[in-house]
Amino acid sequence: MLRETSEGVILSVIVAPNARETKIVGIDGTRGRVKVNVAAPPVKGKANKELMKFFKKLFGAEVVIVRGETSREKDLLIKGITKKEVIEKLEL
């Protein structure tokens, strides 16, 4: 779910688009991913943009999708942050 790199932390998520609001809804134990509802449709990158905006606001850091651009399962790189900081912000 979390891997520290020289650039920051890789966070594995599973996305549910077209939700009422964008929020973290739990942990998918089987997949080892954070479950995130996204209040945007999966059309023309809208859900991806909303997802990155949400995590940028949460962590106060740049966020990029490093894997899963067109999939519900994504790996996000949160730049310039430690694994400990991510755990604290996610309240894991």
From Swiss-Prot:
SUPFAM superfamilies: YggU-like. This is UPF0235 protein PF1765. It holds the Pfam family DUF167. One of its GO terms (cellular component) is cytoplasm. Belongs to the UPF0235 family. Disulfide bonds: none annotated.
